[in-house]
């Protein structure tokens, strides 16, 4: 098969088909863990924003374009890029992360980060 045909075929593949939901899940899980281990509320919130951004993707519930999206080059977010049967568990973990972002108490925010991490870890 000549090179031009291969390039044309790959150009027609939708971006979602090239998405790496597993990589997005791993990154979200890592950032939830970083949040759980943070020494201050700003650190917890920052890493939980990264977790949410990786899970929901741009335009998703809680996506914050002002915060880093460590999964920007991996796809459209773990939730939209995952199989339908995994989405409820991913949504539940994203909600824990959003709850942690909303918490103003360090202990509560860290608890929510730990819960999000544990939920995501089970999906790996």
Describe each PLM feature range:
Residues 2-9:
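Sec-dependent signal peptide recognition
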Residues 19-124:
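Mature extracytoplasmic or organellar-lumen-exposed domains after removal of signal/transit peptides
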Residues 9-18:
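N-terminal signal peptide c-region/cleavage motif recognized by signal peptidases
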Residues 1, 17-20:
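Absolute protein N-terminus
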């Amino acid at each position: 098969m000549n090179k031009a045909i291969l390039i044309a075929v790959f150009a027609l593949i939708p971006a979602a088909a090239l998405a790496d939901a597993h990589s997005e899940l791993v990154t979200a899980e890592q950032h939830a863990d970083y949040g759980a281990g943070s020494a201050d509320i700003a650190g917890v919130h920052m890493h939980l924003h990264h977790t949410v951004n990786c899970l929901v993707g741009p335009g998703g519930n809680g996506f914050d374009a002002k915060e880093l999206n460590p999964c920007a080059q991996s796809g459209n977010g773990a939730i939209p890029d995952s199989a339908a049967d995994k989405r409820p568990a991913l949504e539940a973990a994203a909600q824990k992360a959003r709850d942690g972002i909303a918490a103003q108490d360090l202990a509560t925010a860290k608890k929510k980060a730990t819960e999000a991490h544990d939920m995501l870890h089970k999906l790996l």
